[in-house]
Amino acid sequence: MLDEKLVLVTGATRGIGKAIALTLGAAGATVIGTATSELGAENISKVFTDKKISGKGMKLDVTDNEQVSNLVKNIGEDFGSVDILVNNAGITKDNILLRMKEDEWEDIINTNLSSIYKMSKSVLRGMIKKRSGRIISITSVVGAMGNAGQTNYAAAKAGIIGFTKSLAREVGVRGVTVNAIAPGFIETDMTDSLPQDQKEALASQIPMGLSLIHI
């Protein structure tokens, strides 16, 4: 289905990003999955090899302009231009606003929102040139509903929604689609680290009171 397509997935070492990378790889795509460390990138490459998926893991700090530029340049030299970008990389640093430190705010905005701008812009020219491309960003229901103790995370995820709608209007006529996916509460390594009261608050908003899926 995705033969000859090149996919770039940020934050592919675990959780949602890993599941996306493996699913697209199983569908025939060549997949580049990023990790924040060399060891993480090596682990991605090993998983791809074990699963007989074409592609590799590569180290990337999504907040670093130079690293983003170099990554896309190296991918272009080794594999060609990216057909599908999945902006998945994200972190949490939860705190109530009165106790939130400035670095807790800035780290979330830089990693979860500003990286979307950096990554999307870096691959967009190649997509427009081919008049074909897909940019998919992982946001969250928290971006629409809010959640106490997550003003930073909610602001970043809401920003992704606005960014996505605006960019879609810019490049749709050029053959590039831009969409966002807002998962509910999914059990991953990241959500496992949430305080129990936040898990219960999120679960209370789900009709069955359960997470939708465990990854």
PLM region descriptions:
Residues 13-14:
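Conserved glycine-rich cofactor-binding loop
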Residues 27-44:
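Conserved glycine-rich Rossmann-like NAD(P)H-binding loop of the short-chain dehydrogenase/reductase
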Residues 96-97, 101-109, 191, 202:
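Substrate-binding pocket helix/loop in short-chain dehydrogenase/reductase
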Residues 120, 156, 164:
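Active-site helix of classical SDR
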Residues 125, 169-173:
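Alpha-helical segment proximal to the catalytic Tyr-Lys
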Residues 140:
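Residue(s) in the substrate-gating loop at a strand-loop-helix junction
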Residues 213-215:
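Conserved small/polar residues in nucleotide/adenosyl-binding loops
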